[in-house]
């Protein structure tokens, strides 16, 4: 008996379904969560210099105030720590309680904490930063839950022909979130600058920071709640995925009923077949059986996500420092605080528009043609090449007149991150693990990525400091410099290329059950327990 005959009719119907309105609804509902995620995670990098000027400026100093090293590290990294925790917790919970049951929790947490972040008030600068960090941790916790849940829901709703494009489209909303963060910050800083003009710091230190600037960062952070609020109702209206209802909750009747409404077709209820194909699927995440079947793949998805995020987040969170080091953004003392915010956001918006967003959508359009494996290899190779192109002649790029080419090449590192491993590391873990462990394994892979992001955020902050003590920012020790930091990031990308080559399977055009080995379980069950080999080459016993 063939695999398709052994598969539940409801799952066959999903795999073979033509692209319909419910696919686009799912993309928008899940994608707006990622829009919010990216906006909230990356907009903080646009306002950290403003926070330093508002709360840590000494008018007697020749340079504007900046966040002390420990506070800068906390403000930039605390949301990532929360995200890591949320990915593990909600990934596990999504397999225990169901995808839909916990999907609303993450969005509510994001809404509440986005608003609360902007309401961080206290009597001292340190207390304001502590309150901000507290709410940004829990904001990150909610954001973390969106990773495994959105990826798993989209993979389980999609047909196998265009599944990669659908999951990639959800993730691509992250690019629009990054772009929106830049545009909102541009608009806010320009508007406040026009309403409350101020001189450059070197002209009048005290007057260069207007009191109204304190509203700017608060409004920017709170606006992150808006897209989440707009999609909450539709997120709650989505039915549970048929794969969870059938293969994990083992309720064939409910799965058939839900998907009959979604697909608008009659679907047979197959209680006996469900009992047959789910029999014996009780091995756990930490069992020898899981390690034999999926251990190498979990190592591959976790390791490659870790490596790409070391580079991607350090680049994203510290673009402002790189642009300052090559003199594309003027020295802080030559600007007022709102002009500095405007210039930083303009630079990051340009990078997002020209490199980040196009990369995501190249992945959407090509992933089901080229495949995940090749795109991930291409992306790691491109990031390695362009980072070496920036690092080797780095001193040349700091010379007047060369900054435009530097920014152009720098934009290509973002293009190949997003037309590459930043997107595919999100997609693959949602396709290759069993339904009852899919959300958990995606959460583990994503949390590994955030561990890399934390290393990138905290490590780059210190490592990129100049080697010359005379040019080190106040409160920091000499580091290895931006040039050597770029060499380190290029090395991470090269290792990611090798790990992809050895450990990451191709899932293009295959059903989730084929990739996870569940189809082979069904076939083995029908054949009286015979051994089979799954489509990715792992022996099934």
Swiss-Prot record:
GO terms for biological process: phosphate ion transport. Residues 1-26, 92-100, 146-163, 235-297, 371-374, 425-443, 506-541 are cytoplasmic. Residues 532-541 have a biased composition (Polar residues). Residues 48-70, 122-124, 185-213, 319-349, 396-403, 465-484 are extracellular. Residues 512-541 are annotated as: Disordered. It comes from the Eukaryota. PROSITE patterns: MFS (PS50850). Pfam families: Sugar_tr. Induction: In roots by phosphate starvation. Residues 515-524 have a biased composition (Acidic residues). One of its GO terms (cellular component) is membrane. It is a multi-pass membrane protein. GO terms for molecular function: phosphate transmembrane transporter activity; symporter activity. Its main location: membrane. Keywords: Membrane, Phosphate transport, Symport, Transmembrane, Transmembrane helix, Transport. It is found in: Membrane. The chain crosses the membrane at residues 27-47, 71-91, 101-121, 125-145, 164-184, 214-234, 298-318, 350-370, 375-395, 404-424, 444-464, 485-505. Belongs to the major facilitator superfamily. Phosphate:H(+) symporter (TC 2.A.1.9) family. High-affinity transporter for external inorganic phosphate. Although related to the sugar transporter family, it does not transport sugars. This is Probable inorganic phosphate transporter 1-12.
């Amino acid at each position: 008996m063939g695999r398709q005959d052994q598969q539940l009719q409801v799952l066959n119907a999903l795999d073979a379904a033509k692209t319909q309105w419910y696919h686009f609804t799912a993309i928008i509902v899940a994608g707006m969560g990622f829009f919010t995620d990216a906006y909230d995670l990356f907009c903080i990098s646009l306002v950290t210099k403003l926070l330093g000027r508002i709360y840590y400026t000494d008018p007697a100093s020749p340079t504007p105030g900046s966040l002390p090293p420990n506070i800068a590290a906390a403000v930039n990294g605390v949301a990532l720590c929360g995200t890591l925790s949320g990915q593990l917790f909600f990934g596990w919970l999504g397999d225990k309680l169901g995808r839909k049951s916990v999907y609303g929790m993450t969005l509510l947490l994001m809404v509440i904490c986005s608003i609360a972040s902007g309401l961080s008030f206290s009597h001292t600068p340190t207390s304001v930063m502590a309150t901000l960090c507290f709410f940004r941790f829990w904001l990150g916790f909610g954001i973390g839950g969106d990773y495994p849940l959105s990826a798993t829901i989209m993979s389980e709703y999609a047909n196998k022909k265009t599944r990669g494009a659908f999951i990639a489209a959800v993730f691509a909303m992250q690019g629009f979130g990054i772009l929106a963060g830049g545009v909102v910050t541009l608009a806010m800083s320009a508007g406040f600058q026009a309403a409350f003009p101020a001189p450059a710091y070197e002209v009048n230190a005290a007057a260069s920071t207007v009191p109204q600037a304190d509203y700017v960062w608060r409004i920017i952070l709170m606006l992150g709640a808006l897209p989440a609020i707009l999609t909450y109702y539709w997120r709650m209206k989505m039915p549970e995925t048929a794969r969870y209802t059938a293969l994990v909750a083992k309720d064939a009747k409910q799965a058939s009923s839900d998907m009959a409404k979604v697909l608008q077709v009659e679907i047979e209820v197959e209680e006996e077949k469900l009992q047959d194909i789910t029999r014996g699927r009780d091995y756990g995440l930490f069992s020898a059986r899981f390690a034999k079947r999926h251990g190498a793949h979990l190592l591959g998805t976790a390791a490659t996500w870790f490596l790409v995020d070391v580079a991607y987040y350090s680049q994203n969170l510290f673009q402002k420092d790189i642009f300052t080091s090559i003199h594309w953004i003027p020295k802080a003392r030559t600007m007022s605080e709102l002009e500095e915010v405007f210039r930083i956001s303009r630079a990051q918006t340009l990078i997002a528009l020209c490199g980040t967003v196009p990369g995501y959508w190249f992945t959407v359009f090509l992933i089901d043609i080229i495949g995940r494996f090749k795109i991930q290899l291409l992306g790691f190779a491109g990031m390695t090449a362009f980072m070496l192109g920036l690092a080797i002649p780095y001193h040349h790029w700091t010379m007047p007149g060369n900054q435009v080419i530097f920014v152009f090449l720098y934009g290509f590192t973002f293009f190949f991150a997003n037309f590459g491993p930043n997107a595919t590391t999100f997609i693959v873990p949602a396709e290759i693990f069993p339904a009852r462990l899919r959300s958990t394994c995606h959460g583990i892979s994503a949390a590994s990525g955030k561990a890399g992001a934390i290393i990138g955020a905290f490590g780059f902050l210190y490592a990129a400091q100049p080697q010359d003590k005379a040019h080190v920012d106040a409160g920091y020790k000499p580091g290895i410099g931006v040039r050597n930091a770029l060499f380190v990031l290029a090395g991470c990308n090269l290792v990611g290329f090798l790990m992809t080559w050895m450990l990451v399977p191709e899932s293009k055009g295959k059903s989730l059950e084929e990739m996870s080995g569940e189809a082979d379980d069904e076939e083995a069950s029908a054949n009286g327990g015979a051994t089979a080999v799954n489509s990715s080459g792992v022996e099934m016993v």
